[in-house]
């Protein structure tokens, strides 16, 4: 006998009630996990300087960090091989590569407080010739910049540090791992709800669209968090966090015609600038202290 019935069939009411109870229990348990994690993080952050972004989501615990890091290493090496095959991998002696690696060496020492796993990471920084205005840091500390973001925006060292800190923050906060867990949980909830309501194909279409919007929201939240954590990392390394404002002003000017914020995977430039400015008082003392060090 199937676990769920269409509500039009005999026995459907009892089955639906049982399913609702199960779904409620799952949602409640997930909320409790998230609350406990946030509570521990709040206690931790109360004794530290810098930005407050709370604890990591419990969803990430559903996925193995080591497996993600191993997969990242494989994909990173494949990307570098592909770039080298088309003569797009910028050589190590290039001034821009040296510049990126020098900036990374200043930021990396401040990564471990955000994620203890970084003590075992083998950080790499590479530059690929491409007009893309993009950069990323994969789990395990694998960083790539594209020449387009450096040349088209004419980034200063402080602005490069803001970009790099932002991308490193995604890896430190394990956003990829968290998104995988959220995707699994969202799929489970959508399937249960569709079965509960007997919506058939229409229900599947609606729940798929809802899951997409949830994913977009998760991504915007991740981006906002990475902005703040990245700004703190850069400030602790002695880079001016006010460069986050000029960086996103440049990005906004170069990204005219972007989709509305609620349909974008990234926050709008204006909202990012507002968040950065609101948090500058938390990180400027860190920057001033780092700048005074010999």
PLM regions: where:
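A Zn2+-metalloprotease active-site environment signal
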Residues: 2-7, 13-21, 32-294
């Amino acid at each position: 006998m199937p676990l769920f019935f269409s509500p039009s069939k005999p026995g459907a009411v009892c089955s639906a009630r049982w399913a609702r109870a199960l779904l409620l229990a799952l949602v409640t348990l997930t909320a409790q996990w998230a609350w406990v994690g946030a509570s521990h993080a709040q206690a931790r952050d109360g004794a530290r300087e810098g930005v407050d972004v709370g604890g990591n989501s419990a969803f990430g615990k559903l996925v193995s960090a080591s497996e993600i890091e191993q997969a990242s290493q494989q994909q990173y090496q494949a990307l570098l091989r592909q770039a080298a095959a088309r003569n797009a991998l910028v050589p190590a002696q290039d001034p821009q590569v040296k510049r990126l690696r020098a900036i990374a060496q200043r930021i990396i020492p401040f990564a471990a407080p955000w994620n203890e796993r970084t003590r075992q990471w083998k950080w790499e920084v590479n530059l690929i010739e491409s007009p893309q205005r993009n950069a990323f840091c994969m789990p395990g500390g694998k960083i790539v910049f594209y020449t387009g973001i450096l040349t088209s925006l004419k980034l200063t060292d402080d602005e490069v540090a803001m970009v790099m800190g932002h991308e490193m923050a995604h890896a430190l906060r394990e956003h990829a791992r968290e998104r995988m867990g959220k995707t699994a949980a969202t799929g489970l909830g959508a399937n249960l709800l569709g079965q509960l309501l007997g919506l058939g194909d229409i229900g599947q279409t609606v729940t798929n669209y809802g899951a997409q919007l949830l994913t977009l929201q998760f991504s915007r939240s991740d981006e906002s968090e990475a902005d703040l954590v990245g700004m703190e990392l850069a400030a602790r390394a002695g880079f001016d966090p006010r460069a986050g404002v000029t960086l996103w002003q440049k990005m906004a000017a170069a990204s005219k015609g972007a989709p509305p914020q609620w349909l974008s995977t990234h926050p709008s430039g204006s909202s990012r600038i507002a968040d950065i400015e609101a948090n500058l008082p938390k990180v400027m003392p860190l920057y001033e202290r780092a700048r005074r060090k010999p």
